[in-house]
């Protein structure tokens, strides 16, 4: 069981995550959002696994998450998601991220 994780809710933690994610060749990605209290769903959490660490990114902490853009659009990095439609839609809508080389376990 993987117990190596980092809560990303400060600029310092975001910098640590960015340094590791730049070197990753495979990312496991999931998002959590709240659509119960909001007319338009609100992204709350982004979880990214890059061996050997899981990054739990607080999307409500108002961090600069631009460091995610490069690995998400990289053709050389495999992004593994399950039922990726909403995850991709929210990340594109809220951050303008582009995605390439996606493996959706639901399809």
Task: Mark where each language-model region is.
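Metal-dependent phosphoesterase core characteristic of DEDDh/y 3'-5' exonuclease domains
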Residues: 48-51, 86-107
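Short, glycine/acidic-enriched loop or turn micro-motifs at the edges of active sites
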Residues: 33, 61, 107
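A residue-level signal for conserved active-site and pocket-lining positions in enzyme catalytic cores
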Residues: 30, 46, 80, 104
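N-terminal accessory regions of nucleic-acid-interacting proteins
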Residues: 1-27, 31
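Short active-site oxyanion
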Residues: 54, 74-79
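Catalytic-core regions built around general acid/base machinery
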Residues: 16, 66-76
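A short alpha/beta connector and helix-capping loop motif
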Residues: 37-53
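Short, basic, glycine/proline-bearing loop/turn elements
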Residues: 1-5, 49-57
């Amino acid at each position: 069981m993987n117990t190596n994780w980092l809560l990303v809710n400060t600029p310092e933690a975001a910098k640590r995550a960015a340094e590791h994610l730049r070197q990753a060749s495979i990312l496991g990605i999931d998002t959590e959002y709240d659509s119960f209290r909001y007319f338009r769903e609100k992204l709350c959490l982004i979880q990214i696994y890059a061996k050997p660490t899981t990054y739990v990114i607080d999307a409500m902490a108002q961090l600069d998450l631009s460091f995610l853009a490069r690995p998400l659009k990289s053709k050389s990095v495999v992004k593994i998601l399950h039922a990726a439609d909403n995850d991709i839609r929210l990340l594109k809508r809220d951050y303008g991220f582009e995605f390439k080389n996606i493996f959706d376990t639901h399809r």
